[in-house]
A protein has these predicted regions:
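N-terminal Rossmann NAD(P)H-binding glycine-rich loop of SDR-like oxidoreductase domains
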Residues: 2-23
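SDR active-site strand-loop-helix element
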Residues: 5, 29, 78-82, 118-124
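Short loop/turn motifs at secondary-structure junctions
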Residues: 22, 74, 114-117
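Short beta-strand element of Class I
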Residues: 25-27
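Glycine-rich phosphate-binding loop and adjoining beta1-alpha1-beta2 segment
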Residues: 30-50
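Active-site proximal helix/loop that lines the substrate pocket
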Residues: 34, 83-87, 123-126
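NAD(P)H-binding glycine-rich loop region in Rossmannoid oxidoreductase-like domains
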Residues: 45-98
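Conserved Rossmann-fold NAD(P)-dependent oxidoreductase catalytic core, especially the SDR/UDP-sugar
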Residues: 92, 101-127
């Protein structure tokens, strides 16, 4: 089973599209407040609306340890696509909370659960 974070974003939505075209099971973490609009538009753009229902959405957050532990159960592959990109100094705390603390949470829980295969999406903004 594959666990993916950031599935409601641009890159994560494309990853979910590819996963939905395969037979392997997967779960996607999404925040309660997140919109599925980008993801739905990506599927629609590729004429794959019928595949959207294959997504097993898990409500949670990368800064919510309990939701991560629960969601990652029975997974053997993690695809971490969640993150915030901003060049604004006003976003410094959000960037730290999500991109540093959230990523550490995801990786630590993956290690604790024995998930040994990880794909990690980042950007030049991380530099």
């Amino acid at each position: 089973m594959i666990f993916i974070t950031g599935g409601t974003g641009l890159v994560g939505s494309h990853v979910l599209l590819k996963l939905s075209q395969q037979s392997r099971g997967f779960k996607a973490l999404r925040r309660e407040s997140s919109s599925l609009d980008i993801c739905k538009r990506i599927f629609s753009y590729y004429n794959a609306d019928e595949l959207f229902v294959k997504i097993n959405w898990i409500e949670g957050d990368i800064n919510d340890i309990a939701s991560l532990e629960s969601g990652m159960q029975d997974c053997d592959l993690l695809l971490h696509c969640a993150g915030v990109v901003s060049f604004s100094k006003s976003q410094t705390e959000v960037l730290r909370k999500v991109n540093i603390e959230g990523t550490a949470n995801v990786m630590n829980i993956a290690l604790n659960l024995g998930i040994r295969k990880v794909g990690f999406v980042s950007s030049i903004a991380a530099l």
